[in-house]
Amino acid sequence: MKYDVIIVGAGASGMMAAITAAGHHKKVLLLERMDKLGKKILATGNGRCNLSNAYMDENCYRGQRPSFAYPMIEEFGLEDLIQFFESLGMLVTEQNGYYYPASLQAATVVDTLTQKLKHLHVDILTEFEVTKAEKCKSTFYVYGNDKCFQSSNLILATGGCAQPNLGSNGSGYKLAKDFHHKITDTFPSLVGLEAEGKYLKDTSGVRNVSNVSVYANNELIAKEHGEVQFTKYGVSGIPIFQISHFAIEALRRKKKVKIYLNLMPQMVTLEETTEVFLKSCNYKTVEEFFQGFLNKKLVYAILQRLKIDPRKPVAQISRKDLNRILDMIQHFEVEIKGYKGYDMAQVTAGGVSTKEIIQGTLESKLLEGLYVVGELLDVDGTCGGYNLQWAFTSGYIAASQIGRQ
């Protein structure tokens, strides 16, 4: 039997593509290498599944063509996604601009999509490893598990390399290369950064709301704000994830990357407050004094780095040393030496070059009937539901084009 479309990968983009194509009365085969559908969806949003975000802009996406994704998200965006899930009987709720299934369970999303796939009689094969795909004349041939399937169209929805234990092992890049597509440089993104410094390890476990500024060869390349987590290996947390793409890109280009943290961004009058406290609390040691401002581990790290005795009475501290401490509170330097791997990354940066993909249909410019969607493309979003929105959008866009045939 020849299918109208074969979809390789049953993550968010693959399941959306299958439902959309089947909704256009196309005969669909969905192939998944894992034992269950949507495993990566189950891990998103700490198991709550952050579907999308109220704020949506072109700058929420990265890649060699940052503007590639946004016009398609305008075509099928947040409101369309909400309506789609409501049509399947799943309510969506909003919390501070972040959208989740009303159950706050990622399993609800996977179950809802799976139920619709079955209702539409989509053929599904799990634990199916696609080893080869080719096109001869007007037909695609997809091989794996000692079987071969035929179709008029082929959608690659395999994901990238992030979280390989959930199914994304990079196999889609080989399939795309076999069709002569270029793969841009790929690397982990939305991931923790590794840092050096003997005093930094002493801060492990600390969480601190900070302004984050990233410099590459002394040039500012990114800024963020939020709760930074200090770890044994370096720094993590949402603001670090948000800037990780730019920091890692610079590291891979052999640039010197440093992060500067304003550890007290809420204190615009830090110097004035310090002067007031000095008058009323001059009986404290330097360490005790600044523990009224910051986590004690951070205070200790700052004093150690500046070689200031933490037991020294604050009344005896010189104006020069006081200014040095205040400066470091507002410009705490973290030298970035590396980054965590794909096993800890939320998304893959880079992928199939969007220069070879038709914007608006996601069909290959090199081969008619071949489509590439989701994380496999050189498109990665920031934290907050942007990558799932892109996955659903891209699956819908590609399958809708096939549906019009």
Task: State where each predicted segment sits.
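N-terminal Rossmann-like FAD-binding beta1-loop-alpha1 element of flavoenzymes
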Residues: Y3-L30, A398-G403
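Short hydrophobic core segments
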Residues: I6-V8, L31, V130, F149-N165, ...
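Glycine-rich FAD pyrophosphate-binding loop
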Residues: A22-N46
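An anion/pyrophosphate-binding glycine-rich loop and adjacent beta-alpha core
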Residues: D35-L37, L42-A43, L51-E58, L91, ...
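Glycine-rich active-site loop/strand segments that organize a redox cofactor
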Residues: R48-N96
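Feature captures the FAD/FMN-dependent oxidoreductase FAD-binding
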Residues: E75-N153, V299
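A glycine-rich dinucleotide-binding beta-alpha-beta segment and adjacent secondary-structure elements
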Residues: L125-E127, Y300-D380
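Glycine-rich loop(s) and the adjacent beta-strand/alpha-helix scaffold that form part
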Residues: N153-Y199
